[in-house]
Amino acid sequence: MSSASSSSAASLLLGREVDVFLSFCCQTSHGYFQNILIRNGIRTFLSYRCLEKRFGPIGQRTLKALEESRVAVVMTSTTKPCSVGFLEELLVILEFQEKGSLMVIPIFLTDLSFNVEEICRQHPEKAPSWRTALTKLTNLAAEYPLSQNLAGMDQSDLLNQIARDISLVVFYSGSNDSNALVAMDRHMKVVYDLLALEVNKEVRTIGIWGSAGVGKTTLARYIYAEIFVNFQTHVFLDNVENMKDKLLKFEGEEDPTVIISSYHDGHEITEARRKHRKILLIADDVNNMEQGKWIIEYANWFAPGSRVILISQNKNLLVDAGVMDVYEVRSLRYDEALQVFSHFAFKQPYPPSDFEELAVRAVHLAGFLPLGLRLLGSFLAGKGREEWVAALLKLKAKQGGHIMEVWKLMEATDDKGLEEWETAADIVERKESSQDKSQQESEVAADILIGKESSQDKQ
């Protein structure tokens, strides 16, 4: 594979959904507010269009972030003039809002007005559309209860409150989707028992494990949204790489702004240790023994009643790291998988009778994995029987033994069509042929393709 192809594949695999799009008319408070959201486990995209004083198209990266976001926060201040970049971006944000794909939350740092007189005089041809957009933004402040007028109030406290409210919107908007809710009650009942939230005499640590794409992170984020209000500090770590070195460095760092800019969650975690606070810490994607052991050792310094959850594909890693209990997130049961697939393929809980046999084949092809069920169901939605038969045969032949990597690559493509699916499969095939397969990769592939179906029989 060429270096360009390798880079493209890597970027696709690393692509992540954005929860909240941040658009500020000035740089005031934007870094502080972004850090609050990140500490609440919210994935953000911070736009710097406010710095642009000339006209220019919205970049593809910015557009993609808007398409993926559930919420856009637009922060304004009368003490700072609105820039061309901010106003042009606002027009695009409101287009997404009018289509119903984006919730817009205005935050007024001073009062319900805007510093735009000078820029409107400079660009009279754009002034009408800009003023209309700003009027819509003002109206949204009354329409949405999360919007706040911060004039004369303590901005720090209110920004923290808004961040907490946004976290509920983000987490629960996903939970209201039948795809997210399926099997969640079953998982949560066991996890609640393991967490034993009523016990405040110790720091409890649990591990959540399972194959790639089975829904470990979805479950962890659901847990986070359900219980974070019970803790003084709460942190959801998407990336624990080099966590030990970074936190040890932050322990001796006197300037908290350096801590936050270097590692968004480092300050919260070290403060919880220093001040013996009750913390909820969830660490996703723990993939080596040193990471797990060090997190468990570090957690001993938190206040009694704290809860630490480690997420990994490797059960032995979690046990050897020293977690008290482990829970396996298995692939969906047959009826659950069929319900998730039908939601995306037919917009109803179960398939029509004339598509039932094909739907069952598709569920097996997706490996009972939520990610695969969503992508394959969305792709087949609206197609006729002949198209289903042809697509399922072609996908089964093309899929080979690396279903999870193909699903991840497919998830990152804008158009979930068969051509893009085949391209993703080709990338994985070339990647595998250009390197030796490690024992771990073979085990993961076998678990996904074979073990999943056998696990269904055992449940």
From Swiss-Prot:
A biological-process GO annotation: signal transduction
Single GO MF annotation: ADP binding
Name of the coding gene: CHL1
Official protein name in the record: Disease resistance protein CHL1
UniProt keyword terms in alphabetical order: Cytoplasm, Hydrolase, NAD
Taxonomic superkingdom: Eukaryota
InterPro entries, A to Z: AAA+_ATPase (IPR003593), Apaf_helical (IPR042197), Disease_R_plants (IPR044974), NB-ARC (IPR002182), P-loop_NTPase (IPR027417), TIR_dom (IPR000157), Toll_tir_struct_dom_sf (IPR035897)
Alphabetical list of SUPFAM superfamilies matching this protein: P-loop containing nucleoside triphosphate hydrolases (SSF52540), Toll/Interleukin receptor TIR domain (SSF52200)
Pfam family, one: TIR
Source organism: Arabidopsis thaliana
E.C. number: 3.2.2.6
CC per GO annotation: cytoplasm
Compartment(s) of residence: Cytoplasm
Entry function: Confers resistance to low temperatures by limiting chloroplast damage and cell death, thus maintaining growth homeostasis.
